[in-house]
C-alpha cells in the first residue's frame, strides 16, 4: 500500500481513531499490530524511519534466556524459550540459528556449562535450535584462532536465535497495515 493510500485511509476516518500510537519502534509497532488485529482503528506515527531509535541498537538476538539459567531463574528461561519459539513459528524467515562457542579456562567450567546447557536444551525441547556440545581445545582454536591459547582447556557450543531487527520492524508495520491500521513515518507529532 502506498503512502498516499494510507493518508487517504486516515482522512476517511476523519483523523479519528481508536488508538493513536506515537513512535514506530518495536513496542509501538507491536502495539499497532495487536490493536489492528483486534479490529481497532489504529494510527501509528513515527518521526523518522521505523525502528530507528533504541530498536535498532539491539543485540539482534532472540535468545532463549540462557543468562537467566545461570541466575537460577528457570521460569524466565521457559518464558524466553516460549517467546523465541513463537517468533520462529510466526516469522521463520526472520529468525536463524546462531552458534556460540564458550572457551573453558578453568577445570570446573566444562562440567558447569555442560550441565547448564543440557538443562537449557531440555527446557527448549522441540523448540531447540541445536544441541549443546562440548568441544576439544583444538576444535575451539580451529574455529576461533584468535582466542587466547594459554590455559584454554576446551569449550562448549550452544545455539540461540538471531534476527534482522529492521526487517522485523517493516514486517510489523506491513502487518498492521494489512489488518486495517495506518503506519506512517516521517510525521512529527507536536503536543
Language-model regions: role of each:
Residues 1-19, 34-38:
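Extreme N-terminal leader/targeting segments of oxidoreductases
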Residues 23-25, 47:
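Glycine-rich Rossmann-fold phosphate-binding loop(s) that bind the pyrophosphate
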Residues 28-29:
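N-terminal Rossmann-fold NAD(P) dinucleotide-binding loop
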Residues 32, 36-37, 175-177:
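Gly/Ala-rich phosphate-binding loop of Rossmann-like dinucleotide-binding domains
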Residues 36-56:
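Glycine-rich FAD pyrophosphate-binding loop
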Residues 59-143:
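Dinucleotide-binding Rossmann-like beta1-alpha1 core, especially the glycine-rich loop
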Residues 156-191:
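Helical element adjacent to the flavin cofactor pocket in flavoenzyme catalytic cores
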